[in-house]
Amino acid sequence: MRKAVNTAITALSVLAASDASAASRPATALAPQFVALSEITTPIFGESRIEGALSVTLVLEADSVGAADTLRTRMPELRATALTAALEFSRLYASGYTPVDAGRLSADLNAAMKRAHPGIARVLIVRLDAIPA
């Protein structure tokens, strides 16, 4: 019993020490860096016509402050990459009459955007709509 208590106390002291070291770092090192993209709207193609529109709003989480600054300067290129991935997704998987597979879209966008810029930690979907025509 005493050994279990000592193990628990040791584990708690390690956790407390790691929290104290995290608190001693500057707030800018702890805060994630976010860069917002304007809304992207792509057509949803049916068999012979446009069935609706897919509308998505994205926020990029950068690895660091420097990466966030670089993302802001490369915004046209990143927006073009996101638009291409959204078009491909809407062509293959979207419908104006069914729910959007946000998990698949997130995976596709993350893969495409991370290839375009390695400073992107992840792509967050903050708004997603599929609107029938």
Region spans (language model):
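Flexible, low-complexity charged segments
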Residues: 1-133
